[in-house]
Amino acid sequence: MSMIKTLALSTLAAGLMVGADCVYPQSGTGMREPLAKKERMSFDTPKSMKAEHDELHANLERLTQSGGRTGEAAKSVAKVLDPHFVNENAYALPPLGLVVPLSQGKFECYMSAVLKMTDKLEGEMPTMLSEHKDIAAALKKLKDAATAEKKSAGVEFAEHLAAHAQTEEEITYPTALLIGLYVKSKATQCAR
């Protein structure tokens, strides 16, 4: 993850911990102007994260077709990675679509719907982390096979995906959970 992404997520986290009201002054009741209807319809995974996942999928697909031990090892990675990505796309990444509005001090009651996803992520964290271990084991086999066959693309992919998983564990998942906690704290305004 780039330093800019890390800094942006860290800034959001700090703002959420002390309260966005302190970071971004607001007037009135603390509620913001309604967002455009399109923005209220769903929680979208940030484009940069979607692009990274798409790139990982494309690279893995190429590796599965590379033949030899590397191709077979890549198929093993795909077998454990694909269902994991489905779950991430269902409930771990979409909450991050609220990073920008929340970091600007904007909160709307409809955002409370994200709690279904963040609660699901919280409950599934042990499984998600266990899947990361399975993915890491498959990546080791891929890296070993690619090294033996002198297929640098396999080695690079294994290293990139391992770093990606570490970023998810250290930044992505905790940020999604933090968004859930923040939205939960703000949702009390909606019940009044």
Regions found by a protein language model. Name each.
Residues 2-8, 17-192:
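Small-residue-biased structural context
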